[in-house]
């Protein structure tokens, strides 16, 4: 990929950076990782192939199959019908908090992000959203 946005939509890059970094979080999609020669080399060996049987399952499912061929000739494979985070496999509250904090803390102080997360998780219980919006506005100044 030519930039971080393209990296986020590149299956070869996403697979390669996840394998190299053992993580698919926001840190795996930075400029540093886009330029990482190990990630680039591995991504160049990824082949994306449509499987009509899997495509036919859409839109009810979002299936995928991954096959990894090792240098010693062994083959590792796995298949899923859903993406993590779908209604079939929802994120836990702990996972949502971790993801929110990892993204928010790139822009705002960690303490503020923790407070904001807690407020957002109860937004449906607020009688008045104006204090929350004012807090966000103040952080943007």
Positions of PLM-derived features:
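Terminal-appendage/accessory-domain detector
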Residues: 1-141
């Amino acid at each position: 990929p030519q930039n971080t946005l393209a990296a986020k939509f590149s299956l070869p890059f996403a697979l390669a950076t996840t394998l190299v970094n053992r993580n698919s979080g926001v840190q795996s999609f930075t400029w540093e990782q886009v330029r990482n020669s190990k990630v680039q080399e591995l991504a160049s060996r990824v082949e994306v192939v449509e499987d009509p049987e899997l495509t036919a399952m859409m839109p009810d499912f979002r299936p995928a199959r991954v096959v990894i061929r090792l240098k010693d000739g062994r083959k590792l494979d796995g298949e899923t019908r859903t993406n993590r985070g779908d209604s079939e496999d929802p994120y836990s509250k702990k996972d949502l908090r971790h993801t929110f904090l990892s993204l928010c803390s790139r822009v705002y102080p960690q303490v503020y992000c923790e407070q904001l997360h807690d407020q957002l998780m109860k937004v449906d219980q607020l009688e008045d959203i104006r204090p929350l919006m004012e807090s966000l506005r103040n952080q943007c100044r």
